């Protein structure tokens, strides 16, 4: 199952890899001590706030440790040549908090949430290839029938929407309140 709990021994094993012109792309489960500073810095860029990193980093570690043991959510890190470029989470739709008032998740729906800072770790084309790579991996699991990605307001809103569209997702539900996201979706090929 895509969201089976993860037990770490020393380092997470590579779940999938592929070669790009820019190098080797790998998908792994998040390894808290090694990947958390990158994820936190990406969140910091997305929020455009100057947070005190240490207390929040400790809370994020606990949160990701919880996700690792979850049966309904899982966190992954995508690396190019061993360096992280973004974190992506998969959440079982019916068990995840509703993202939009006009949408009810069904069995087989999975939400993905991507933390990528300002998309400044690689060329934008690498992000497109990387997200396609993740979707291919997620769709290997028979329980995954549809993937839904939210796009919230923010300085990178258009860039995120373009990433999803160029990866093959289609917009299907626009926000109706300021706090709701637009939703994009793709079905199992």
Spans of model-derived segments:
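Short beta-strand or tight-loop elements
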Residues: 23, 74, 86
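Alpha-helix boundary/capping residues
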Residues: 43-46, 67, 167
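Acyl-donor (CoA/ACP) binding surface of acyl/acetyltransferases
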Residues: 1-19, 27-31, 35-36, 82-189
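An amphipathic alpha-helix signature
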Residues: 33-40, 61, 65
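Helix-loop element at the rim of GNAT/NAT acetyltransferase active sites that forms part
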Residues: 41-55
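Active-site rim helix/loop that mediates acceptor-substrate recognition in acyltransferases
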Residues: 55-75
């Amino acid at each position: 199952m895509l969201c089976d709990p993860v037990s770490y021994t020393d380092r997470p094993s590579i779940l999938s890899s592929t070669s790009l012109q820019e190098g080797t792309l790998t998908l792994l489960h998040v390894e808290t001590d090694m990947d958390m500073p990158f994820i936190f810095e990406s969140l910091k860029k997305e929020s455009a706030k100057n947070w005190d990193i240490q207390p929040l980093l400790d809370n994020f570690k606990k949160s990701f440790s919880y996700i690792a043991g979850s049966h309904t959510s899982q966190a992954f890190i995508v690396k190019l040549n061993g360096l992280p470029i973004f974190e992506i989470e998969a959440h079982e739709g019916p068990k995840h908090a509703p993202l939009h008032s006009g949408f009810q998740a069904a069995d087989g729906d999975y939400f993905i949430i991507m933390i990528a800072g300002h998309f400044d770790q690689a060329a934008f084309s690498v992000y497109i290839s990387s997200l396609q790579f993740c979707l291919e991996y997620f769709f290997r699991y028979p329980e995954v029938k549809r993937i839904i990605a939210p796009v919230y307001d923010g300085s990178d809103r258009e860039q995120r929407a373009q990433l999803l569209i160029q990866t093959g997702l289609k917009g299907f539900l626009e926000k109706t309140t300021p706090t709701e996201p637009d939703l994009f979706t793709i079905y199992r090929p």
